[in-house]
Structures are given as C-alpha cells and as structure tokens.
UniProtKB/Swiss-Prot annotation:
Subunit relationships: Homodimer.
Biological process terms in GO annotation: D-allose catabolic process; pentose-phosphate shunt, non-oxidative branch
Domain of life: Bacteria
Keyword Isomerase recorded: yes
Organism: Mycoplasma genitalium (strain ATCC 33530 / DSM 19775 / NCTC 10195 / G37) (Mycoplasmoides genitalium)
Protein's UniProt name: Probable ribose-5-phosphate isomerase B
Residues annotated to bind D-ribulose 5-phosphate: D10, H11, G70, T71, G72, V73, G74, D103, R113, R136, R140
Length: 152
C-alpha cells in the first residue's frame, strides 16, 4: 500500500492491537506498530496517542492511525489535541464508514473493553474501505481547521 497505518494502544488494548496488526498485514497494509510491545499496567494512553497522532499529522492526507484503549475515549481525546488530526471513536461498522466518508477521520479510536475483537476487525475494515466524500462535508471540516488555527 502507498500509505502507512500507525497503530498503538495502552495496556488494555495490547492484545487487540496485535490481532488488528496481523489482520492488516495479511491484507498487505503497511502497519507501523508504535507500542507498547509488552504489558505494563502503569502505561498511560496519552503517550501512545500522541505518538500515533504526531506520525499521522506529518502526512495527514495519506497516512492513517489506529488507537486502542479500554473505552477508546481517552486515546481519542488525546489524539484530537494534535493539530491536523481528526480522530473518531467508533463502536459500529456504520459509524466507521461515516467517520471517513463524512468527517475525513484520519485516526480510528477503538474500545478493547466494550466492543468484541471480531467487531473491531469489521470496524477497521469498513474504516479503511471508505473514502472521504468531500462536498458539504469538506465545508464542515474546513470550519474545524479554521477554528483550530484561529485559537492557537
């Protein structure tokens, strides 16, 4: 593939991260695992969220990110603090597609506790299959970007 998928999690998402990484590699995606590589109950999700978000922002029109924590909320909040990142917490296949089609999300945030591994795989697949539709949706994204610049 001509783009990277950066993936990371906290300790609660470690197993799911490995499952998703292997799934994507079998589909020939270029997956870059940013950690963790071992279980550490004291790790902090913002550290991994910032790693992925910083990588995605460098090539935000191509590269994508996947972040995992217990709820998906924490990594989503942290990733959205990085300028140029549009992170979406997704818990269903339908919203996975819409996050890309309508919101041009470039970071997918997943819950390892409240969504099954198999459902998360479907969410990832639908997210990656979808493309941004532009049009009226671009106007809305432009407003977000403009506000981000105005409030620096």
């Amino acid at each position: 593939m001509s783009f990277n998928i950066f993936i990371a999690s906290d300790h609660t998402g470690l197993t799911l991260k490995k499952i998703i990484s292997e799934h994507l590699k079998t589909k020939q995606f270029n997956v870059v695992d940013l950690g963790p590589n071992y279980f550490d109950a004291n790790d902090d999700y913002p550290d991994f969220a910032f790693l992925v978000a910083d990588k995605v922002k460098k090539n935000s029109d191509k590269d994508l990110g996947i972040l995992i924590c217990g709820t998906g909320v924490g990594v989503c909040m942290a990733a959205n603090k990085v300028k140029g990142v549009l992170a979406a917490l997704v818990v269903s296949e339908k919203t996975a597609a819409l996050a890309r089609q309508h919101d041009n999300a470039n970071v997918l945030c997943l819950s390892s506790r409240f969504v099954t591994d198999s459902e998360n795989i479907k969410i990832v697949d639908d997210f990656l299959k979808a493309n941004f539709e532009g049009g009226r949706h671009q106007r809305r994204i432009d407003k977000i970007i403009r506000y981000e610049k105005e409030t620096e």
